[in-house]
Each structure stands twice: as C-alpha cells, then as structure tokens.
C-alpha cells in the first residue's frame, strides 16, 4: 500500500525508494579525509548544476537530491520529459521531512567518502544506511594510486622520499608524478630529467613532492607514455560480483574530463579495433575482475571504472604491454602498446553516465539516436553554469572528441 508524503506527488512503496546524490567533489574529499569538507567553488557549482543527472540511471520512484527542483526539472527535460515523471527531485529540507516517515531504502551517491557520510548524518539519514568509518577507510585505500600500483599496474612505484622521486625521473627520462588522491589533473606533475640536468635542482617541484609526502604519505612515479587514445572499462559491484558494463571512450583537455562517445558497445569495440583486438580487451577485462572482485566484495557495492591508455611502444617502454594482432600474436607491427590501468575510480564515472544516457536515449527513441548513430556527450562551462550536452558526430584521428 502506498504512503502519501506532502512533498511527493505519488505514492511510495516500502523497500523500493533510493536516494541518489551527485557529489563530483568526491575525489577531493577523499584526499582531505575530513568529516566536514568544503569543496572549491567550481566543485560546488558542478554539483549544483548537474545534480539532476542521477535521473538517467535511477529507477521508477527514486529520489534525486538537488538544490533547486524547478532548475533540475528544466535541465532534465532536455533528455526526455519522461524522466521528470520517473523520479522525484527533492531538496535537503524536504529530505529531512521525508525521513520522519522512515521509508527510505538506501543511499546511492556518486562516490562514498567521510565528508559525504557527515553530510548525510546531519541530514538525519539513519546510521544503518551509511557505511562504517572502517569500510570508508578501506574504500579510500583501494581508491588510492598506491593500491593501484601494488595490484594492477606495472612500472609504477610508490615513493616516500624526495630523493627517490628524483632518481626515478632520471631513470625514466620523462615521468608522471601523482599524489595518491587527486581530481581532474590536480595532484599530477609531468617532469623531465632535463628539468634537473639544466638547473641541477628543481626547487618548485621538490617542494610540491615534499608537501604531497607530508600530507598524503607519498607519491607514485611512472614513465610518461606517448598517448594515442584514452579509454576506460566500466564495472559494477553487485551482490559480491564485479560485472562489466562497457567501454568508455573519452577525451581530456589539460588532464580534465571533457567528453564521451555515445554509441553502442559493439560500435565502441569497432572503433578500438584499429588499435587493439576485441580478444585482448576481453583478457584485460577478466584480469581486472580477478583483482577487483575479491578486493571489493566485502566493502563496496556500486559502480567503478578503470582508466586505460593506448600508446606508442618504444624499445624502452618495457611496462607498456604490446598490442596483439587478431590471432593474439605479439608481432608489434603497429608499434602500439596498451597500459591496462592508469588509475582506478572507485565511484561512478562519466563513462557510466554515457552508458546510461545512451541506453535511455535508445529506449526512448530520441531524435539524436534516430539521426546520428554516434554522438558526443560533453560537460561544458559557459562562464556561468555547467551543462551536460549531446552533440552529433563521432571522433576522428585528428580530433578524437572535438
């Protein structure tokens, strides 16, 4: 039997209503690891402007937390009027009132961190619906680049001394130095051995490394590869199993996310075939599942992704796996290699959004899907607000997602 709430326009049923939250500041909150964390202005605005996007994957009758209901309804209608009737947008004051009826089933954020838990506690979300601090500490550990270096990467070293960082850079020639937790290119430095050879010391960089080691315990150092294409594999932990959801073909500008290809999985595999075989992709996928499933089964349920890279493979690129031909032979005719783990995103990703948006558009026979088999999903900033937009077209060699 449905229970009426004055803030909702339809009846809600026991054990079916979920609360969805878009908290894109998650990676920064992981780094801070505080119960009360204030994201930079850009992060807060992104959260407010795109708070509606969980409507793309939420189920019938679910709640989506937003700052402004009318604004969210106006934004989501561009992706189909049916989304406004499928979910209920709700503000924090309304959420507090709703909890008095105690019919909320579960909470599904973009990513779990200590700051979000504190925010939800202040909203009155029952403790039983929130992860324990011990579980959050484990999620934070698996989210770190240190964990990825130990379990899924080759040629990446976690370093706790500045002198060793310099030694590795001189060894690699060109290297990427990363903080264990960071977001959208922050906490990532590209360094050349030449920077040290010409100046002897590199005080600005060394201060940055020392600061990262002091605040986060260390940094990772890896060789700098000559990138050909970014891509990712998206997964979901459900009932203790890691399930594959699909490929993500995305682009970055200055190391910050800029867009995703919107098309079927078959089409994405076809786009990748000139670079890597379907069989090799399947092998990488199974290796990731083999590592992540046992690591996550007792601590995490929800989406996650693994970023990867196709690169040119030189003789010195010993840690970059050779791309195999269709028969699985390492003939290295293409001169390409694959890095099967750049980093782990233990949260929902824009790749998941692209998969869900494409499925929604196909299911509702949108004009975009009828006119263009392949589209581009972009997050754009117009100087005032962030927008999630669909643009016709497909990537090219000259402009992968432009």
Where are these regions (language model features)?
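Phosphate-binding site of ATP-dependent enzymes
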Residues: 173, 202-256, 305, 309-324, ...
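Conserved N-proximal alpha/beta basic substrate-recognition cap immediately N-terminal to
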Residues: 44-56, 65-167
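Glycine-rich phosphate-binding loop of ATP-grasp-fold ATP-dependent ligases
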Residues: 175-205, 232, 254-272
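Flexible, glycine/charged-enriched surface loops at secondary-structure junctions
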Residues: 296-306, 368-375
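Peripheral (often C-terminal) accessory segments that flank ATP-dependent C-N-forming ligase machineries
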Residues: 326-329, 363-402
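ATP-dependent carboxylate/phosphate-activation module, predominantly the ATP-grasp catalytic core
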Residues: 235-292, 325-326, 330, 345-368
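N-terminal-proximal low-complexity accessory segments that begin disordered
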Residues: 18-56
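Short, positively charged and aromatic/hydrophobic N-terminal segments
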Residues: 3, 9-16
């Amino acid at each position: 039997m449905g229970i009426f709430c004055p803030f909702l326009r339809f009846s809600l049923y026991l054990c079916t209503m979920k609360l969805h939250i878009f908290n894109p500041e998650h990676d920064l909150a992981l780094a801070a690891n505080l119960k009360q964390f204030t994201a930079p202005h850009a992060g807060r605005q992104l959260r407010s402007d795109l708070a509606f996007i969980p409507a793309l994957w939420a189920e019938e009758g679910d709640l989506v937390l937003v700052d402004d209901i009318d604004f969210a309804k106006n934004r989501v209608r561009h992706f189909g009027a049916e989304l406004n009737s499928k979910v209920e947008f709700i503000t924090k004051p309304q959420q507090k009132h709703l909890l008095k009826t105690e019919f909320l089933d579960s909470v599904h954020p973009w990513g779990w961190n200590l700051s979000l838990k504190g925010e939800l506690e202040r909203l009155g979300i029952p403790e039983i619906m929130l992860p324990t601090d011990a579980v959050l500490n484990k999620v934070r550990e698996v989210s770190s680049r240190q964990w990825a270096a130990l379990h899924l990467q080759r040629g990446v070293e976690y370093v706790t001394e500045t002198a060793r960082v310099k030694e590795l850079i001189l060894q690699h020639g060109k290297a990427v130095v990363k903080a264990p937790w960071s977001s959208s290119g922050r906490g990532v430095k590209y360094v050349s051995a030449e920077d040290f050879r010409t100046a002897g010391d590199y005080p600005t960089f060394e201060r940055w490394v020392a600061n990262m080691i002091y605040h986060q315990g260390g940094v990772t150092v890896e060789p700098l590869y000559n990138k050909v294409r970014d891509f990712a594999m998206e997964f979901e932990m459900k009932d203790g199993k890691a399930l594959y959801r699909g490929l993500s073909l995305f682009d970055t500008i200055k190391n910050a996310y800029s867009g995703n290809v919107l098309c079927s999985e078959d089409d994405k595999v076809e786009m990748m075939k000139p670079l890597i075989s379907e069989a090799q992709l399947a092998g990488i996928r199974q290796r990731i599942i083999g590592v992540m499933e046992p690591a996550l089964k007792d601590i995490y349920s929800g989406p996650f992704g693994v970023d990867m890279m196709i690169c040119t493979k030189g003789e010195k690129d010993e840690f970059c796996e050779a791309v195999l031909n269709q028969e699985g032979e390492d003939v290295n005719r293409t001169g390409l290699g694959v890095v099967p783990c750049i980093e782990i995103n233990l949260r929902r990703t824009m790749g998941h959004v692209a998969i869900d948006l494409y499925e929604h558009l196909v299911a509702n026979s949108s004009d975009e899907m009828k006119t263009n088999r392949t589209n581009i999903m972009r997050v754009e900033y117009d100087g005032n607000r962030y927008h999630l937009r669909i643009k016709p077209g497909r990537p090219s060699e000259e402009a992968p997602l432009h």
